[in-house]
């Protein structure tokens, strides 16, 4: 390399290095962390429940933590897609959408205060309703108003869509006299006030309703409960800087160690958090594919060859998910056994 070229090249390399370090520093120096919160109830009710926890997060991370409330789950997913929020509390269904479409990544999972490994979807009716079962609902659907959940809700939409409707060969939007989509709280209050005949709900929201509106909770009757749903995940955007991810993970996974911290998240019905990853969504992905399969299998508008092709594709995806789920369960069992062995050795 000639001396003149060297004189030109070295400052250029140094300049590029400085520019790169400035970009890295800019990435790491976040003034405000934006936390998305799905709309299980009205935002004015959620703000005071979240504020103590978010204030502790801000103090620990050394940045402002700004909550982002929206009218529906899709708005929180879209906010992550366009980098308007940095992390979010989702249900499993909305987390799946965030991971697949919005550059999200699961890093933690809530642990319920009641010690349960998850929660359950419910169908509720008014206490005085003659409806006593799913069979009663389906038999009288043409005369009933149905309060369905947000389309991106796990317990309010996906789980009942499969277990209550798809497994019985029907689609909720097609069988009722009228169908409305609302958040959990609105659905419950609508049933209590006799504005809808039957609605989706969940056990976590039922506990909150019993604390906030015990008179309304007394007006509800549960006529169906789903299989267990995994606890809710926390999701950050993949583009968040690694230093911030580390600080955030350390804060979240240690939160709940003190009595004061547990008291602050008790209104959210959580005790602490555990580490998690995108594989938490495997059972939810199975459920989504099962629902699609049931829909295709019952679609008379498809010719036989096209139906078989689509079903074969879905079956292959289900087989793959089944293998991944078995591998994860085996790894979890092995880890749990190792933990027991270590504890006994001590």
Segment roles from a protein language model:
Residues 34-39, 112-122, 214-249, 262, ...:
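Periplasmic-binding protein-like
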Residues 74-88, 101, 119, 184-199:
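Short helices/loops that flank or line small-molecule/ion binding pockets
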Residues 92-102, 165-166, 192-193, 197-218, ...:
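A ligand-binding cleft/hinge motif common to bilobed small-molecule-binding domains
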């Amino acid at each position: 390399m000639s001396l003149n070229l060297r004189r030109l090249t070295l400052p250029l390399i140094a300049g590029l290095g400085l520019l790169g370090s400035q970009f890295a520093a800019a990435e790491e120096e976040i003034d405000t962390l934006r936390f998305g919160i799905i709309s299980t109830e009205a935002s004015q009710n959620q703000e005071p429940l979240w504020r103590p926890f978010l204030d502790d997060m801000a103090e620990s991370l050394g940045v402002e933590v700004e909550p982002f409330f929206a009218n529906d789950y899709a708005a929180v997913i879209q906010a992550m897609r366009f980098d308007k929020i940095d992390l979010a509390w989702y249900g499993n269904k909305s987390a799946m959408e965030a991971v697949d479409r919005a550059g999200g990544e699961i890093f933690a999972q809530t642990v319920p205060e009641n010690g349960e490994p998850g929660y359950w979807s419910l169908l509720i009716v008014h206490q005085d309703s003659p409806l006593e079962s799913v069979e009663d609902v389906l038999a009288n659907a043409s005369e009933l108003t149905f309060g369905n959940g947000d389309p991106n809700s796990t317990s309010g939409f996906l789980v009942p869509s499969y277990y209550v409707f798809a497994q019985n060969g029907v689609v909720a939007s097609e069988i009722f006299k009228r169908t409305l989509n609302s958040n959990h709280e609105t659905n419950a209050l609508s049933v209590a006030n006799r504005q809808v005949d039957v609605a989706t709900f969940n056990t976590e929201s039922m506990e909150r309703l019993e604390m906030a509106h015990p008179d309304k909770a007394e007006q509800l009757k549960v006529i169906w409960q789903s299989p267990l749903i995994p606890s809710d995940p926390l999701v950050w955007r993949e583009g968040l800087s690694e230093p911030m991810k580390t600080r955030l993970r350390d804060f979240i996974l240690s939160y709940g160690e003190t009595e004061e911290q547990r008291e602050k998240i008790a209104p959210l019905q959580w005790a602490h958090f555990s580490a998690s990853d995108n594989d938490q969504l495997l059972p939810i992905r199975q459920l989504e594919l099962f629902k699609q399969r049931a829909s295709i299998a019952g679609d008379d508008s498809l010719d036989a060859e096209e139906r078989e092709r689509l079903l074969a594709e879905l079956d292959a995806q289900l087989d793959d998910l089944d293998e991944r789920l078995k591998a994860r369960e085996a790894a979890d069992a092995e880890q749990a056994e190792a933990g027991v062995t270590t504890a006994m050795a001590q």
